Amino acid sequence: MSKRHSGYQRQRDDVNETPFWVTRVVLPYLQQHCLHVWDPANGPASKIAQVLSGEGFDVIATSDDFLARTSLPHANIDSICTDPPYGRDGGRLACRFIEHALELVPVVVMLLRIDFDSGKTRTYLFLDCGSFAHKIVLLDRIVWFEREGADPSGNHAWYIWNSKHNGSPSIEYAGGERT
C-alpha cells in the first residue's frame, strides 16, 4: 500500500469532520458494549456525536484539552469514541490520546490510519495490550474535504480496546454502502 499527498492545503486549526457513514460502521460494537459515550476531540456539533445521539446513546462531545483532563466530564461515561488528532509527529499525539483514554474508561474506540497498528513502537497498544479487542477496516476511503478531481488517498480503521476483552483481537471489514 502506498501513500500519496492529497494536494489539499491544510489551514491552521481546520476541521475535518468524520462522515456519518464512518461512525455508523462502529455502531454494532458500541451498541453491545456502551451506553454513555464521550467524544473528546470534535466538539458538541461533531458528526460522531450526532450519529451516536441519534441512535440513543447518551453522548458528551467536547473539544477542550483532552490530555490535560484528569477526570471524566460526567461520572457515568463508560466509553470514548473519537477521531483523535494525529499530529505532525508520526502519530505520537494519537498514541497519547489512546493511552490517556485507556486510563479513563473501559472501552476506547479510535478512528486511525489503517496501518497505525503496524509500528513496532506501538506494540504496547496492540500486541502487548490485553484490552485491544477489535479492528474494523473501512473498505471505502474517507472523503475528508470535497474537492473536484480529487480522490481520497488514505485508508482508515476503527480500533477498539475493551478492558473486559479476553483472548485474541478480531478483525472485520466494512464499508459505507454496507452500513
Annotate each predicted stretch with a short phrase.
Residues 1-179:
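Class I S-adenosyl-L-methionine-dependent methyltransferase catalytic core
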